Each structure stands twice: as structure tokens, then as C-alpha cells.
Amino acid sequence: MKKIYIYLAICAALCACGENPTLDMAGMFSPQGPTIKTRFDHSMAYNEKVGEIHLDMQQDNYIVYTCADSHINKAHRNLAYFINQYEAETSPKIAIHLGDLIDAQYNFAEADSVLQLGGRSIEDTLFITPGNHDIYFYQWDIYRSYYKTSVYWFDTNNGSKKLDLFICLDSADGELGNKQVNWLKDLLADKADDGYRHIIVFTHTHLWKLDMSQGHTSNFALESTYELTSILGQYGVDYVWGGHQHARQLVEYNGVTYMAIDATKDQESNQAYMIANIGDKITYDYPDYPKVSE
């Protein structure tokens, strides 16, 4: 009986927050929008329409600026700093955001005012993968109105010389779904003989659960982790970059290096981004965001 009273008290407290537009009571018991199958189908349709993305870096070495978990609401100091640093970089470069761009509903316009990516095109060099906060509350249609696709690949080259393959996976639900897994296997098999230096997969949800920072959403189901790590190891993937944990992590397994990076969210305890120096080898720096006195 005591447990029932506690449960009712929690429900009453949540219902009392009904005017909060970021609280979706129905979403506690039902899906938060289109399933990964639908998002995958939408993404494939867009990818087929715009064609493949091949980026000529003009040289063999270049830089990848990478951030995660900016959780934009009305505060975007760190994300603005990241974009400013990226734009000031004079070396050949691309940038990747590893998801949870926004914190809750109605924040995409605010985030895009910083990214200035509205109506993303294949000429852009800033790439995004969705996080759970970007998809929750039935926001997929809004997300894709800005960023168009959540599952895609691109590669880099120096003229006719192929360099590196990047693959973006949609793990916003903490799963990939059968269609996306099969697409990944087919893509890796098709590219196996193309001679890439590095194959880098990037996605939001980290594959390895090293803490409970994100509760039950921390990573994939055990069966999915086993399947994905087997595929990634089998087809020669070198790195998997992720976020979601809000803390830096590194795991090496079956020939693949799995990396999670710190958060870009303002006021987070771990505030840093990653600069990957891509060449025959990859080295990493983790600059902190500037501290702001209270």
C-alpha cells in the first residue's frame, strides 16, 4: 500500500507540471515520435535525392572539431565558442556534433542561430547526428527540416586519393534497428576494398556503459552491443565517436577504439570538446571551454 501512495504522489507531482512544455506525460508511456525505421527511411530518401558527399581536403592531413551534448535552451555560450574556434581554424577542417544539440522542445531555432546551418546542403562541412533530446517530444520532423538526414556517410580525399570514411548512425533511441544495421553492414562490405586510411563511425549513444550517469538510457541493449561490436570489428572500423555520457571515456575492443567525449552544455562539470588531427595516425586534443565566474 505504501508503494501505491508513493506512486500516486509522483504522478500528482508530474501532472502539476502540466504547463511545462518540455514535460511530455504521454511520452513516459509511449514512443517519443517516429521510430528509427521511419527515420531511416526518411534519411535514405533524402540521401538518394542529394547524392554522395566527397570532401576534397586539398592535402592528406586535416582537422576534425568534435563536440557533443550542447543541450541548447536559451544558453549557448559554449556552442558559440566551439563554432567560433572552428571558423577561425585555418587548416583544412570539418566539424561534427555528436547529438543532444538541444535540451527540449522549441530550441532548434536557437541552436541553429549559432550553427547557421538551416537548410543543410552537401557543401556543408559541419555534420550532425541526433541525440535522444533532439528526437524526444515528436521533434523528428523539426529536426529534419533543419538537418535533413540522420543516417549517412561521407568521405574525404586529396584530389583523386581517397583518405577517410565517416559514417553517421542514428542511435537517438539507444538502438539502430534492423534496417540500419543491414545498411551499415552493406556499406562497410562495399567500401572494404576502397583503401581508406581510417574508418570512423560517429553516433550519439556510446556503446560501452562505464557508469550510471545517464541512468537506463546509458547505452545499447546488451544484444545490440554484441552485434554491433562484432560488425565493426569484422569490417575494419578504426574508431567510434560518441557522446551522451557527458564524460570522456575510451574503450578498446576487438581492434576498434570507442571514444566518448565531454559535454558542451553550459555549466556542466565536464566542459570540453575534441580536436582530432587526422593523418596517417590520429592524435587528439581536448580543449576546455573558458570558465565563467559565477
Protein language model features and the residues they cover:
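Sec-dependent signal peptide recognition
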Residues: 2-9
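C-terminal motif of bacterial Sec signal peptides marking the signal peptidase cleavage site
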Residues: 13-16
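N-terminal active-site segment of His-dependent metallophosphoesterases
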Residues: 18-109
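Binuclear metal-dependent phosphoesterase catalytic core
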Residues: 21-43, 248-294
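Beta-strand-turn-beta hairpins that frame and shape the catalytic cleft
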Residues: 52-65, 153-167, 195-198, 252-258, ...
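Active-site glycine-centered loops adjacent to acidic/histidine catalytic or metal-binding residues
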Residues: 69, 99-100, 131-132, 204, ...
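Core catalytic region of metal-dependent phosphoesterases/phosphodiesterases
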Residues: 78-156
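His/acidic metal-ligating clusters that form di-metal
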Residues: 85-94, 121, 175-258, 282-285, ...
